[in-house]
Regions:
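Short, well-ordered secondary-structure "scaffold" segments embedded in the functional core
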Residues: 83-190
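Structural motif
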Residues: 60-68, 163
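Short, amphipathic alpha-helical "recognition" segments used to contact nucleic acids or chromatin
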Residues: 66-82
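Short, charged beta->alpha transition segments
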Residues: 56-61, 74, 126-129, 172
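Charged, often Cys/His-bearing segments associated with DNA-binding zinc-finger transcription factors
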Residues: 1-62
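Short secondary-structure transition/capping motifs
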Residues: 18, 62-65, 75-76, 91-94
Length: 190
C-alpha cells in the first residue's frame, strides 16, 4: 500500500504524526512548493537545461505525480528520517529512486519554506529584523546544544576544529525559540 496525500489528508492524527503539520498548515505549503519547483524544473527545458523538443508529460507517469505527493514525500523524510529503502517502500519507489527524489526535493522544500518566511535565520545580524517581520513580542528562550563528533584524521581539519582543551570534540549550536509560539527564530551555524 502506497502512502498518498489524498487518503492521508482525511486522517488528522496520521498527517500530524508523519509530517509534523496540521491540515491547515499543510494547505498553505503546496502553492509555495509548486512555485519553488517551477523555478528548478521549468516545463520547457529538459533535465540537463536544454530546450525541450517534445511536449512535457510523455512517458511513464511517476509515483510522485502531484505537487502534494512530492511535498508529502519530502516532509515525511524530514520528520522521520527513515532509511531510504523504507521510504521507497512506503511511497512505491526503489531505494535509488528515493535517494534521487530526496536530493532533488529537499532544496525545493527549503526554498518554499524560506519564501513563506518560516525558516529560522542563521545570520546573527539579521535576527532582530527577522523577528520584527513576524510582529510578535514575546519571551525568547536561548539554548545551546552540543553534539559529539569523531575527531578528524586530517591534521589541517584537526587544527580548525580543536579548542586546545583536552575534552571530546563536538559541534555547538545556539537556538533562540519564541516561548509562546515555540517557533525557532535563530539557529546558529554549526
Amino acid at each position: 500500500m502506497v502512502l498518498e496525500y489524498n487518503r492521508l489528508k482525511k486522517d488528522r492524527r496520521r498527517l500530524l504524526a508523519l509530517t509534523g503539520l496540521t491540515r491547515r498548515e499543510f494547505v498553505v505549503l503546496p502553492q509555495a512548493f509548486r512555485t519553488a519547483y517551477a523555478t528548478v524544473d521549468p516545463g520547457d527545458k529538459t533535465a540537463d537545461g536544454s530546450v525541450r523538443k517534445r511536449q512535457a508529460g510523455g512517458g511513464r507517469k511517476g509515483q510522485l505525480g502531484t505537487t502534494e505527493q512530492k511535498l508529502l514525500f519530502s516532509l515525511v523524510y524530514q520528520k522521520t528520517y527513515p532509511l531510504q529503502a523504507l521510504l521507497g517502500e512506503v511511497f512505491g519507489l526503489s531505494q535509488s529512486r528515493a535517494n534521487r527524489w530526496i536530493q532533488r526535493l529537499l532544496p525545493i522544500l527549503k526554498q518554499a519554506l524560506d519564501d513563506l518566511g518560516v525558516l529560522p535565520t542563521r545570520v546573527p545580524n539579521k535576527f532582530a529584523p527577522h523577528e520584527h517581520r513576524h510582529q510578535e513580542t514575546a519571551e525568547l528562550s536561548i539554548d545551546g546544544t552540543e553534539r559529539r563528533r569523531p575527531r578528524p584524521k586530517n591534521p589541517v581539519k584537526q587544527a580548525l576544529c580543536s579548542s586546545g582543551k583536552q575534552k571530546p570534540q563536538s559541534d555547538k549550536n545556539v537556538v533562540v525559540v519564541n516561548a509562546k509560539t515555540k517557533r525557532v527564530g535563530y539557529l546558529s551555524q554549526t
